[in-house]
């Protein structure tokens, strides 16, 4: 176990969650299942070069090759046809997931302008947390000079928690800076 965040989970967070929620087994304790990064590139409809740039940026941020997402239906108002490439996403699990979460909590989020913590209300009712990033420049891998367009991305942290309370406690103990 090379990752510090994973060691912290096994040695500190998991026992604390078992104690707090009175779980009978360590397998009942919620854990982070996966992290999905999604970048919607609506302007890829008119210029496909924008999508290639988004894919490259997401590849740098995540450390693995993203998959291109396609439109499910045609929407005339957006000049969109079914099957057109309109975004990119990547799913992180295991070692890379812990590396990314560690980097997000300790390096990237503190680089956000006027950062006072992330909202603690963005849980979905099943213990999963969604976070929107307004600009990709907060990640250290992105070279400020090579970016010709500021893009945001969505980060979904999927947990095995049964409810929001368990999910919030898990992420708080892992070090997620929730706003007070």
UniProtKB/Swiss-Prot annotation:
Subunit organization: Part of the 50S ribosomal subunit; part of the 5S rRNA/L5/L18/L25 subcomplex. Contacts the 5S rRNA and the P site tRNA. Forms a bridge to the 30S subunit in the 70S ribosome.
Keyword Hydrolase: no
Keywords: Ribonucleoprotein, Ribosomal protein, RNA-binding, rRNA-binding, tRNA-binding
GO CC annotation: ribonucleoprotein complex; ribosome
Pfam families: Ribosomal_L5, Ribosomal_L5_C
Alphabetized GO MF terms: rRNA binding; structural constituent of ribosome; tRNA binding
Name listed for the protein in its UniProt record: Large ribosomal subunit protein uL5
Function: This is one of the proteins that bind and probably mediate the attachment of the 5S RNA into the large ribosomal subunit, where it forms part of the central protuberance. In the 70S ribosome it contacts protein S13 of the 30S subunit (bridge B1b), connecting the 2 subunits; this bridge is implicated in subunit movement. Contacts the P site tRNA; the 5S rRNA and some of its associated proteins might help stabilize positioning of ribosome-bound tRNAs.
Taxonomic classification: Bacteria, Bacillati, Bacillota, Bacilli, Lactobacillales
Family the entry assigns: Belongs to the universal ribosomal protein uL5 family.
Family annotation (InterPro entries): Ribosomal_uL5 (IPR002132), Ribosomal_uL5_bac-type (IPR020930), Ribosomal_uL5_C (IPR031309), Ribosomal_uL5_CS (IPR020929), Ribosomal_uL5_dom_sf (IPR022803), Ribosomal_uL5_N (IPR031310)
Example GO BP: translation
């Amino acid at each position: 176990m090379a990752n510090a965040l994973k060691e912290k989970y096994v040695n500190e967070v998991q026992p604390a969650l078992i104690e707090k929620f009175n779980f009978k087994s360590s397998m009942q304790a919620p854990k982070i299942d996966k992290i999905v990064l999604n970048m919607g590139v609506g302007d890829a409809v008119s210029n496909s070069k924008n999508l290639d740039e988004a894919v490259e940026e997401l590849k740098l941020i995540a450390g693995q090759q993203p998959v291109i997402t396609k439109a499910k239906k045609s929407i005339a108002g957006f000049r969109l046809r079914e099957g057109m490439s309109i975004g990119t996403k990547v799913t992180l699990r295991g070692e890379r997931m812990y590396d990314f979460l560690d980097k997000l909590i300790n390096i990237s989020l503190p680089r956000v302008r006027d950062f006072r913590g992330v909202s603690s209300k963005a849980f979905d009712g099943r213990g999963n947390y969604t976070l929107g990033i307004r600009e990709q420049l907060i990640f250290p891998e992105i070279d400020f000079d090579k970016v010709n367009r500021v893009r945001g991305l969505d980060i979904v942290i999927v947990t095995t928690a049964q409810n929001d309370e368990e999910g919030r406690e898990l992420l708080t103990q892992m070090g997620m800076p929730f706003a007070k």
